């Protein structure tokens, strides 16, 4: 009997590891939306070339993701496989954290496996490639799992780890991590004071101080300017959030546009089924005075509410469907503790909804690739990305911007050939952020992303434009740039959008493919 339990305890995590890896590997290798798909490709590679985010190029989020990707490139080689391996590993980490969280509540292995398989299906595979929002989402969930475990099971070492998770989640993406950190801090202070947990507080304080020292040491060792960090990672993103919450005309996403029945309920119906069920179960619990269960439910409800509101304010496709198995599992725990286990029907209904919704969103996001806006495209026309370079194998290339993938492949190959033959000091501005890696050359990227509405970097109308412009010109001068290449889909990246970034510099324009590919040589200005 003991050996059987041991085998189950070993076999289930192994199955989850294999499944979490393979489902993300399958999803991540189909389709491309360049601005998202390659967001951490060249930035991660640039770190290996000692060109660092914030210090040498503009980012406003994803700092930890960049360095983590650099680590994967260093350990496993600079290739697409290492890139997908990174995302698949985070999917494994999130799934295993969920598994061991549920194990604390003594649920049988079968339902835990169902919930975790659903989580692995609906979590990272919706994107498939490294994505700052999903890193922050998963690390924020892990923070919540650890906090609940620390509060209910009185484990001091977890209190020490929590501040490290704060840093990891926040420097993956500022939101939703900031809200989750605030939630945990609120409940933690209440826990320390109400229960007089001096030992818990001491471990938490030690973790806070040590993690802060490590972070400051990192800034010192990488020579990352504090001023640049504050502007790029704090002040500029605040202007984006303010615009969205205030529904300003220039905001990429407006809160007022999100407040409609279809968006609020239709897109999240399966989440809401479990959310409101758990909400009403929690209200009933107040009359039974089960403090631990009330605490669990309230923390999970507030966490999911934060994720839901944060999702509404994002310009991306929905990525929080993995809240479905999370909420379902918490309802399962409530039924079990409240002796609902005597009736099988509630559990059957839970499993049916979880399995059905998992299959539905697996088809829509992991197979049809809705996250990349290619759900209506025939995937059979996809082209092997290895035609561009063998290091992009086994990616299947198909994007929403070209009806024929071959045309986009040819455009990229022509650009690679021309840029490789140019031995001048170069800069490339593109969302095909893999040129530095494929050419094994520092191409002096300016940003991770390039949108012209103050949502990725300050443009002329933004109050921090001069800060950004100063950085651009400093990089141009320091790296002795002689020519700037622009590459994108039709009218995506035009020189007219960037020419005002440069001080007293004149250019000779050369158009290769109109509105798609051009290069601009720096020349002596004529009086």
Where are the model-predicted features located?
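Transmembrane-helix motifs of polytopic, lipid-linked glycan transferases
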Residues: 85-106, 142
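Short periplasmic/luminal acceptor-recognition loop of GT-C membrane glycosyltransferases, typified by
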Residues: 367-370, 379-453, 482-492
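Short hydrophobic alpha-helices at membrane interfaces in multi-pass membrane enzymes
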Residues: 146-168, 197-206, 293-302, 343
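Membrane-interface transmembrane helices that cradle and orient dolichyl/undecaprenyl
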Residues: 103-106, 141-160, 193-195, 275-293, ...
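Membrane-interface alpha helices of multi-pass inner-membrane proteins
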Residues: 120, 158-176, 180-185, 210, ...
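Transmembrane-helix signature of polytopic, membrane-embedded enzymes
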Residues: 98-121, 291-296
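Specific aromatic-rich, kink-prone transmembrane helix
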Residues: 135-153, 158-166, 187-190, 326-330
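Short acidic/glycine- and proline-prone juxtamembrane loop motifs at membrane-interface regions
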Residues: 126-136
